[in-house]
């Protein structure tokens, strides 16, 4: 199963200048728990923003830079090869974790979307594709209010392809 996991504002912004637009500790914990032990596929810019491989996961980085390498990751040149490497692990689920270009490439291949919907309109330069309800079914939604650790209200949503 191919899944995309993302935190996106109501206008689908996910980042600006290769940085997240918010700090939501519960979302970071949710991301870790959901992806733990699974292969994660990301673009080079996303990896560079993380600055190191995600522990407890098989990290696969897509880049067009032929000579690029980093310790602790598998480097590939395209999404198809990344998916092949991830499938070879025999894990039950493969996670695409960003960034914007990789999400666009993987969106039509995805079976499931894990979306942390940040309930705010925030300016960004990187966006997640729109989720159309004629193609996707919302199967779970859990709402959380803003609090002292979370500047924005947010929801954990799970969508499955119809």
Residue ranges, per PLM feature:
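Enzymes that bind and transform nitrogen-containing heteroaromatic metabolites
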Residues: 1-162
């Amino acid at each position: 199963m191919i899944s995309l996991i993302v935190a996106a504002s109501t206008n689908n912004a996910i980042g600006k200048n290769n940085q997240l637009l918010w700090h939501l500790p519960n979302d970071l914990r949710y991301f870790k728990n959901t992806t733990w032990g699974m292969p994660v596929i990301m673009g080079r810019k996303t990896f560079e923003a993380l600055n190191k491989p995600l522990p407890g996961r098989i990290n696969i980085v897509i880049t067009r830079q032929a000579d690029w390498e980093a310790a602790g990751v598998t480097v590939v040149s395209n999404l198809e090869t990344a998916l092949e490497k991830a499938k070879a692990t025999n894990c039950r689920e493969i996670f695409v974790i960003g960034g914007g270009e990789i999400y666009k490439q993987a969106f039509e291949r995805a079976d499931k979307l894990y979306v942390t919907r940040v309930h705010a309109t925030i300016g960004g330069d990187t966006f997640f594709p729109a989720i159309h309800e004629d193609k996707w079914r919302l199967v779970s939604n859990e709402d959380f209010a803003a609090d002292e650790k979370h500047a924005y209200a947010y929801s954990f949503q799970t969508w499955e392809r119809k």
